[in-house]
UniProtKB/Swiss-Prot annotation:
<keyword id="KW-0479">Metal-binding</keyword>
<keyword id="KW-0234">DNA repair</keyword>
<dbReference type="InterPro" id="IPR023627">
    <property type="entry name" value="Rcmb_RecR"/>
</dbReference>
<dbReference type="Pfam" id="PF21175">
    <property type="entry name" value="RecR_C"/>
</dbReference>
<dbReference type="GO" id="GO:0006281">
    <property type="term" value="P:DNA repair"/>
</dbReference>
<dbReference type="Pfam" id="PF02132">
    <property type="entry name" value="RecR_ZnF"/>
</dbReference>
<keyword id="KW-0862">Zinc</keyword>
<dbReference type="InterPro" id="IPR006171">
    <property type="entry name" value="TOPRIM_dom"/>
</dbReference>
<keyword id="KW-0227">DNA damage</keyword>
<dbReference type="InterPro" id="IPR000093">
    <property type="entry name" value="DNA_Rcmb_RecR"/>
</dbReference>
<keyword id="KW-0233">DNA recombination</keyword>
<dbReference type="GO" id="GO:0003677">
    <property type="term" value="F:DNA binding"/>
</dbReference>
<dbReference type="InterPro" id="IPR034137">
    <property type="entry name" value="TOPRIM_RecR"/>
</dbReference>
<dbReference type="Pfam" id="PF21176">
    <property type="entry name" value="RecR_HhH"/>
</dbReference>
<dbReference type="Pfam" id="PF13662">
    <property type="entry name" value="Toprim_4"/>
</dbReference>
<protein>
    <recommendedName>
        <fullName>Recombination protein RecR</fullName>
    </recommendedName>
</protein>
<dbReference type="GO" id="GO:0006310">
    <property type="term" value="P:DNA recombination"/>
</dbReference>
Length: 200
């Protein structure tokens, strides 16, 4: 089926979303145009407003509409703990744990093959943030448990060691409520390597 130029443009725009392929984009476009034009208009307005009004927090670099995000503006948070994550979605995930420290959001992870070095992901800004604050005693490296995430955490840990700060890594392994037979070998090996004694 051949679509008109405007429909084709809408389909191509929808395909920029993660996980949306050609067929899904076509279904979405036709749904909005045939059955939910008011929803399509709301979507277009919300997207336009977000693209214009949402920027980055000047301290932690997460997404926000204000100069400081709610976490950085909160004076009741623990100024001795800094949690470093790969992206804004990670901040929301860590917040669900009850973490009450501060954040710094990298722009991804080190990936030399993709041309992403320390400068590209914001490691110099991270080090400047640590220096400027002067209150952090521990930096929690909560990068993803991938080869690139581990390399990024290791690189940052080396920089922090030179400054006399504690660098810790979030634990990885068997998920709470998970069954061993369903866990992949790499995850299980990581769990065994990071085992801890049971405190009674």
């Amino acid at each position: 089926m051949s679509f008109s130029p405007l429909i084709r443009q809408l389909i191509d725009a929808l395909r920029t979303l993660p996980g949306v392929g050609q067929k899904t984009a076509q279904r979405m476009a036709l749904q909005l145009l045939e059955r939910d034009r008011s929803g399509g208009t709301r979507l277009a307005q919300a997207l336009s407003q977000a693209m214009e009004g949402v920027g980055h927090c000047r301290q932690c670099r997460t997404l926000t509409e204000d100069d400081l995000c709610p976490q950085c503006a909160d004076t009741r948070r623990d100024d001795t703990l800094l949690c470093v994550v790969e992206g804004p979605m990670d901040v929301y995930a860590v917040e669900q744990t009850g973490f009450r420290g501060r954040y710094f959001v990298l722009k991804g992870h080190l990936s030399p093959l993709d041309g992403l070095g320390p400068e590209a992901i914001g490691i110099p800004q991270l080090m400047a943030r640590i220096e400027e604050a002067g209150t952090f005693t521990e930096v929690i490296l909560a990068t993803n448990p991938t080869v690139e995430g581990e390399a990024t955490a290791h690189y940052i840990a080396q920089l922090l060691q030179n400054k006399g700060l504690i660098a810790s890594r979030i634990a990885h392994g068997v998920p709470l409520g998970g069954e061993l037979e369903l866990v992949d070998g790499g995850t299980l090996a990581h769990s065994f390597a990071g085992r801890k004694p049971i405190s009674l």
